[in-house]
Regions:
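N-terminal subdomain of nucleotide-sugar transferases
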Residues: 1-52
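Active-site proximal beta-strand in glycosyltransferases
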Residues: 3-4, 112-132, 137
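A short, flexible beta-alpha/helix-coil linker loop
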Residues: 9-14, 65-69, 128-129
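Short acidic, glycine/proline-rich loop/turn micro-motifs
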Residues: 14-18, 70-72, 131-136
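A short, charged, and often flexible helix/loop element on the N-terminal side
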Residues: 57-86
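Short N-terminal targeting/anchoring amphipathic segment
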Residues: 89-104, 108, 118-120
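Conserved small/polar residues in nucleotide/adenosyl-binding loops
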Residues: 143-145
C-alpha cells in the first residue's frame, strides 16, 4: 500500500521540544516508521526541513516556512502547499492519505474529493475549539462523528 502522511504545520522529524514539536511529531514519526515495515510511506510537511529516503519511508519538506512560525501565520500557505503537493507527487498513486492536525485535514479533504483517494484525519489537538468558535476559521459542518 502507498500511504501519504501529511503534517503540514510541523516536521515530524524535527527536534522534539522546539517550536511546535511535541507529541504529534513523535506520533507521526513512529506510525510512519511502523507502517513502512509493510508499506511505502511518504511523509510531507510545509515546514523547512531536510529531506531523506529510507527503504520504504520517504520524507519531504516543501520548504514553505521556517520552524517557529505561528500556526496562524502558517495558514496562509495552505493553498500553496496543496499546489506543491500536486506538482511534486503523483497523488493518484497513493492508496490512502493520513492527515495530522486540522490544517492538514483541510488539504487532505480537498485532495480526497478531487482525486477520489480515501483519507484519515487525526486531530491531535482540540485547541482551536478551546479558543472559541470562529466561523471564518472552522466549518463545523465538515466534522462527522
Amino acid at each position: 500500500m502507498n500511504i501519504l502522511q501529511i503534517s503540514f504545520h510541523t516536521s515530524p522529524f524535527g527536534s522534539i521540544g522546539k517550536f511546535d514539536s511535541g507529541g504529534l511529531n513523535v506520533y507521526v514519526q513512529q506510525i510512519s516508521k511502523q507502517l513502512s515495515n509493510e508499506n511505502n510511506v511518504t511523509v510531507v510537511t510545509a515546514e523547512k526541513a531536510e529531506n531523506f529516503k529510507t527503504d520504504n519511508l520517504d520524507f519531504y519538506s516543501l520548504d514553505l516556512f521556517e520552524p517557529g512560525l505561528s500556526v496562524d501565520d502558517k495558514e496562509i500557505h495552505l493553498q500553496e502547499f496543496k499546489i506543491k503537493l500536486e506538482e511534486n507527487f503523483e497523488l493518484e498513486n497513493f492508496d490512502i492519505i493520513h492527515a495530522h492536525y486540522w490544517l492538514s485535514g483541510l488539504v487532505a479533504k480537498q485532495i480526497s474529493e478531487e482525486k477520489n483517494i480515501p483519507y484519515i484525519f487525526t486531530s491531535h489537538s482540540l485547541g482551536i475549539f478551546l479558543e472559541g468558535y470562529n466561523k471564518e476559521r472552522v466549518d463545523l459542518s465538515l466534522i462527522h462523528i
